[in-house]
């Protein structure tokens, strides 16, 4: 197989915002930088303030098989976008809804729902961008020589949700690396030099792992082969992962049927108690 990048034009990614769309664009560009040779048109739709604009952008995305990434603060607009996207079969990524919901619960206050209110402190703003950039660059075991720079290292077998959980934590300001656990592939030596209190082993029960893997195969339209989608093999693999985590003294978190927000909250609580200097 050639190591040369292959140019691949993909359907567009719509950045929908009630403001300028800068945050959504930044996250999109940082993430796309990890896909060498991929050409994904970014279409920024700023200043979205009414339902007719929502309907228009969803329709455009549906016709082009596009994906919508949105940072809408107004709840009614966000709900309408998600509703229409479901109806039209359009993939959508909500960058702020989960964070708003969590903070509303913690603070016991309702968000204002107005775009453009945030004027970031320069240092905090760039620290968060650094966290996102680090996390994107250290996805799926990349750059193991820099694992020592991570606030959190997630380890787990295929389909436990390492990448989306890593990105959610990064948006909250945490530098996160994730490392795949594969029987045929030795874990990087650098992982064992990381403070084990920073390493979190993720577990998803075998039935859900199998369902996720089968869904992925159907979506990709390919058969990976072997025992990848075997339930018996998944049981064995999950138990092996548990033993591996215990062997190295890594905290194990079972994320079966948990939302990303719940899993992130559990991890943040653990890490914050262990390292009070972290965000």
UniProtKB/Swiss-Prot annotation:
GO terms for molecular function: ADP binding; ATP binding; phosphotransferase activity, phosphate group as acceptor; protein serine/threonine kinase activity. InterPro entries: Kinase-pyrophosphorylase, PPDK_reg. Its EC number is 2.7.11.32, 2.7.4.27. ADP binds at residues 156-163. Pfam families: Kinase-PPPase (PF03618). Coiled coil: none annotated. Keywords: Kinase, Nucleotide-binding, Serine/threonine-protein kinase, Transferase. It catalyses: N(tele)-phospho-L-histidyl/L-threonyl-[pyruvate, phosphate dikinase] + ADP = N(tele)-phospho-L-histidyl/O-phospho-L-threonyl-[pyruvate, phosphate dikinase] + AMP + H(+); N(tele)-phospho-L-histidyl/O-phospho-L-threonyl-[pyruvate, phosphate dikinase] + phosphate + H(+) = N(tele)-phospho-L-histidyl/L-threonyl-[pyruvate, phosphate dikinase] + diphosphate. Belongs to the pyruvate, phosphate/water dikinase regulatory protein family. PDRP subfamily. Bifunctional serine/threonine kinase and phosphorylase involved in the regulation of the pyruvate, phosphate dikinase (PPDK) by catalyzing its phosphorylation/dephosphorylation. This is Putative pyruvate, phosphate dikinase regulatory protein.
